[in-house]
């Protein structure tokens, strides 16, 4: 029987979790229940003991991933979010947590040990601990190497949300051990964003205007209006007033 989309995606996430648990956490993590959540302005989150078996025999932590960002992040970046949340789980079971939502030095040290550099900006030079934290991938670090090996083994995150969001945070680049940026493609080359957009399966980038859409331009002096293609503001001039037309 062919696996359903749900089975396929969850098996891939479960497999990635188990793989990172072995190679980055020495098999210490107890497992969890995975969910897909479109929570605003977050790539994912961890919640301890969030689920309880209905008969009371057993409970499970939750790790959530936000599918709205799958299409606009490379696979290893989404996997780095999974590993980030696994560090939270490791600390919940084996470390000492600080107040709710605060990322302390112990968490930061564990992140760095698996090859993810904590940073409040997502870039070198950011604070290593604090309330609002993200990270960047260290080139050649344990996570960088293990995620590449995992992706080479086969399909990973093969289903993407067709209603996508642009990445709102900085954790999208790869940096070397000294903090120098490593060149990389801005989007996963296995995902054809243009094709999906043309097919109506993705929302077009709001930052790019369709050249076929006409814009209204106004002379700021005599208030004469005209319509033309996008990008003409300041480039065309009112003959009567000798001033450029502007967006209106």
What do the predicted segments below correspond to?
Residues 2-72, 96-248:
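Metalloprotease/metallohydrolase-associated module, dominated by Zn2+-dependent proteases
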Residues 73-77, 81:
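Short, conserved micro-motifs enriched in small and acidic residues
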Residues 80-93:
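Active-site recognition of the HExxH zinc-binding catalytic motif
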